[in-house]
Amino acid sequence: MTSTASHAFRYSTVDGEHRHELEIKRSRFITVLRRAETEEAARSLVAELRREFHDARHHCSAFVLGPDRMTQRSNDDGEPSGTAGAPMLEALLKGSAVDGEADLSDVAAVVVRYFGGILLGAGGLVRAYSESVSRALATAPLIWRERLRLMSVEAPHGSAGRLENDLRAFGISVVGTDDGPTATSLRLAIEDAERAGAAFQERLATLTGGGCVAVDLETSWVDVP
């Protein structure tokens, strides 16, 4: 299953691991959410929980990976088809950090079920697995992941300090400096979006009278608390 989301510059994810337990008609639903950036990491969580809860009847799972949520998987693990993994995945896809925007990714969810002796029916299972993940997400700590452009700007030694202060005053992150024989190289990080890049170039031209040029180095995803 794939997503048609547009190219992402920011998304939210779970900060570490989070657990939540729900009881429905004597069945225990233990939800474990964990940040996972690869399929291997997501499947490793399932394997770990099979060992930890080895006497449970079901270990159903779903995960969403990638800034654009391009990798989406789910597994019913013995529950009737479509009653566990799919509603879990749907709950993850509705996950968001703020403003109601569905942007949660790089997260794996496993719901461990201990059967309580009362059959829930297909509809009841769908609601139970969906609610288990939704409630876990409601209390899970989330963080932002932002894609930043790393850039380099060279300025003469005599004006580099002032330029650095001016850039910081504009809210531009200066992540490092390197002194060369005749100039200082400032390493900067800005939001990797077209409008942010254009605004930065305008500010740089204004601050330096067009005397400094920014050189793109690379892009990098970083955690933003």
Report each predicted region and the residues it spans.
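Helix N-cap motif at beta-to-alpha junctions
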Residues: 38-39, 156-160, 189-198
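Short glycine-/aliphatic-rich beta-strand segments at the starts of folded cytosolic domains
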Residues: 142-159, 186-188
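Glycine- and acidic-rich phosphate- and metal-coordinating loops
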Residues: 64, 104-115
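C-terminal regulatory domains involved in ligand/effector binding and gene-expression control
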Residues: 1-83, 195-202, 206-225
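Short, charged beta->alpha transition segments
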Residues: 85-100, 139
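Long, charge-dense
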Residues: 122, 126-150
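Short amphipathic alpha-helix segments
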Residues: 154-174, 199
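C-terminal binding/interaction regions
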Residues: 181-185
